[in-house]
Amino acid sequence: MGMKIIAGDDVIVISGKDKGKMGKVIKVLKKKHCGKDVSFAIVSGVNVCRKSVKATQKSDGGIISVEKPINLSNIALFDSTLGIQTRVGYKFIGEKKVRFMKSSGKVIE
């Protein structure tokens, strides 16, 4: 089965410290943990942590902001036409399988 959320989607955080924040998915990460598939997403402006970087010959040291991954169960696709979170469904248009928003029925490009 395909991924419900992919890079480039507009999402909203539905639980956690950043609840209610919106952003665009930069990257989706999949890995195995204890025999199960676990998926995370890096979302712009969400779960931002500060990191100390040591000075090297090429770059100066300092404190930078880094976006950390967030579990896919904590985010939902955002429907901009209705302004609410929505679930993702799949349907066939001709021979092609496409994703669509269940709240509005709009096909996701």
Curated annotation (Swiss-Prot):
Species name: Ehrlichia chaffeensis (strain ATCC CRL-10679 / Arkansas)
Record family assignment: Belongs to the universal ribosomal protein uL24 family.
Purpose: One of two assembly initiator proteins, it binds directly to the 5'-end of the 23S rRNA, where it nucleates assembly of the 50S subunit. One of the proteins that surrounds the polypeptide exit tunnel on the outside of the subunit.
Subunit text: Part of the 50S ribosomal subunit.
PROSITE patterns: RIBOSOMAL_L24
Matches recorded under InterPro entries: KOW (IPR005824), Rib_uL2_dom2 (IPR014722), Ribosomal_uL24 (IPR003256), Ribosomal_uL24_CS (IPR005825), Ribosomal_uL24_KOW (IPR041988), Translation_prot_SH3-like_sf (IPR008991)
CC annotations in GO: ribonucleoprotein complex; ribosome
Pfam family, one: KOW
Listed name of the protein: Large ribosomal subunit protein uL24
Gene Ontology biological process terms, A to Z: translation
Record keywords: Ribonucleoprotein, Ribosomal protein, RNA-binding, rRNA-binding
Molecular function terms from GO: rRNA binding; structural constituent of ribosome
